A protein has these predicted regions:
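Short beta-strand His + acidic residue motifs that chelate non-heme Fe in jelly-roll/DSBH
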Residues: 20, 41-43, 65-67, 73-78, ...
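His/acidic/aromatic-lined binding-pocket segments of jelly-roll/cupin-type domains
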Residues: 9-10, 29-34, 65, 75
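Short, surface-exposed coil-to-beta transition loops
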Residues: 27, 70-71
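Double-stranded beta-helix
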Residues: 49-50, 55, 72-123
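Glycine- and acidic-residue-biased ligand/ion/polar-headgroup-sensing regions
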Residues: 27-46
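A short glycine-rich, His/Asp/Glu-containing loop-to-beta-strand
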Residues: 1-22
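Extended, positively charged loop/linker patches that create polyanion-binding surfaces
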Residues: 41, 45-66
Length: 123
């Protein structure tokens, strides 16, 4: 938990919802490297407007994204069996409420999360 760099393999399936969040206070960069499968990495401004949408798929030569500190972001998994390698500066800091986007549904609201992810795909 106190390591200077945190690394995690994460296996994800379509329908997995990662609420939009940021890493602020402490400010941390985050890197996603897609090892298998594909996903959309989506960045937002403070009002929830999409500022960037990046399709990551190693079969197409698009492997990863580095997300700057304090930038709102989420992912939408596109392919079954997707595996990502996440790298973030340590030490571990759990997400606090101010770092979860108030303009997006919470993880506990499955239907709203499904609708949100569908909307992200249609943009």
């Amino acid at each position: 938990m106190d390591a200077p760099i945190h690394r995690m393999l994460n296996a994800l399936e379509p329908g997995t919802y990662l609420p939009p969040h940021r890493h602020k206070n402490p400010d941390k960069e985050e890197v996603y490297l897609v090892l298998r499968g594909s996903l959309l990495a989506i960045l937002f401004d403070d009002e929830g407007n999409v500022t960037e949408k990046v399709h990551l798929n190693p079969a197409e030569g698009h492997y990863g994204i580095e997300i700057p500190p304090c930038v709102w972001h989420t992912i939408v998994v596109l392919e079954s069996g997707t595996v990502i390698y996440e790298i973030k500066q340590g030490p571990f800091a759990p997400l606090i409420p101010e770092n979860l986007a108030s303009w997006a549904p919470p993880a506990t609201d499955e239907e709203a999360a499904r609708v949100f992810m569908q909307r992200m795909l249609e943009l």
